């Protein structure tokens, strides 16, 4: 079997730990039965010997298989990693979701997406990345009494994500450490209102209001100071037709949404201005993970 699990972009400005969307950029894992366990990696992480000896996907897959069947059979895992590591594009969520969903499939169980999502919460306590990897599209999420609840909206095929990917990785843990423990009431109210408005914009596909809706007062500026070029990325993106321009997850990547007829121009302008960074265009994914027998 093969599973494709998409990259995700979380927070989307004011939706800290609660909003996210899914990109057509996939990690692929092919799993076949054999007499011993083996791991083959190409793409991201292929030069890291430790990923073969202590592989998070394999570990979570085996934990899930043991839970479901009481056994951990041997398999060959062939990874094609396309999602950059530590760039705020949900590489870890892709691993977690992919491992759990594929274990259910290989164990002969029906793959229930809501169940996969809630199993994933054991490994990733914030649903803004794992939810779009499961459901696709734009997702608004809450966790209530240990259970994730999601509302999903499909994203128009007219939109493209123009993603600036710096050469500098970001640690989510370190990035969170830059944030204060308390916030002024006015900033909290601003984020709540903007997150609600942003959600309505995606549901109604009112993309012309995304720039206003995606204003954040709680985390982006503090995180962006770690890579000050990102302030210029946003400035240029808006001058060049972006509908919204926000830090992707905790960074270091920057997500810019644009109409597809503006995406290539926006990409070229950003690449010219930031030759040291990668700038890629992705379609938006509305399906979440894909299982292929």
Swiss-Prot record:
Pfam families: GHMP_kinases_N. It is an enzyme of class 2 (transferase). Pathway: Amino-acid biosynthesis; L-threonine biosynthesis; L-threonine from L-aspartate: step 4/5. Belongs to the GHMP kinase family. Homoserine kinase subfamily. PANTHER family: HOMOSERINE KINASE, HOMOSERINE/4-DIPHOSPHOCYTIDYL-2-C-METHYL-D-ERYTHRITOL KINASE. It is found in: Cytoplasm. The gene is thrB. It comes from Campylobacter fetus subsp. fetus (strain 82-40). ATP binds at residues 84-94. PROSITE patterns: GHMP_KINASES_ATP. Catalyzes the ATP-dependent phosphorylation of L-homoserine to L-homoserine phosphate. It catalyses: L-homoserine + ATP = O-phospho-L-homoserine + ADP + H(+). This is Homoserine kinase.
């Amino acid at each position: 079997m093969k599973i494709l699990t998409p990259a995700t972009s979380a927070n989307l400005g004011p939706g800290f730990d609660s909003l996210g969307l899914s990109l057509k950029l996939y990690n692929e894992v092919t799993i076949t039965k054999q007499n011993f366990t083996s791991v083959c990696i190409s793409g991201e992480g292929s030069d890291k010997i430790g990923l073969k000896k202590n592989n998070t996907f394999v570990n979570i897959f085996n934990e899930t298989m043991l839970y479901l069947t009481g056994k951990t059979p041997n398999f060959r895992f062939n990874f094609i990693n396309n999602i950059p590591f530590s760039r705020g594009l949900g590489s870890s969520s892709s691993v977690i979701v992919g491992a759990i969903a594929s274990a259910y499939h290989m164990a002969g169980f029906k793959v229930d997406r809501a169940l996969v999502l809630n199993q994933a919460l054991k490994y990733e306590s914030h649903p803004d990345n794992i939810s779009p990897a499961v459901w696709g599209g734009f997702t608004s999420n809450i966790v209530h009494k240990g259970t994730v609840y999601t509302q999903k909206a499909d994203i128009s095929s007219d939109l493209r994500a123009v993603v600036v990917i710096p050469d500098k990785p970001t640690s989510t843990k370190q990035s969170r450490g830059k944030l204060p423990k308390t916030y002024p009431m006015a900033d909290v109210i601003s984020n709540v209102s903007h997150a609600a408005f942003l959600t309505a914009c995606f549901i109604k596909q009112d993309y012309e209001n995304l720039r206003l809706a995606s204003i954040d007062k709680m985390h982006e500026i503090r995180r962006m100071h770690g890579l000050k070029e990102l302030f210029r990325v946003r400035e240029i993106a808006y001058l060049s037709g972006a509908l919204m321009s926000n830090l992707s997850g905790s960074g270091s990547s920057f997500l810019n949404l644009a109409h597809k007829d503006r995406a290539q121009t926006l990409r070229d302008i950003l690449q010219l201005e930031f030759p040291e960074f990668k700038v890629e265009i992705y379609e938006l994914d509305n399906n979440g993970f894909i299982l292929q027998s």
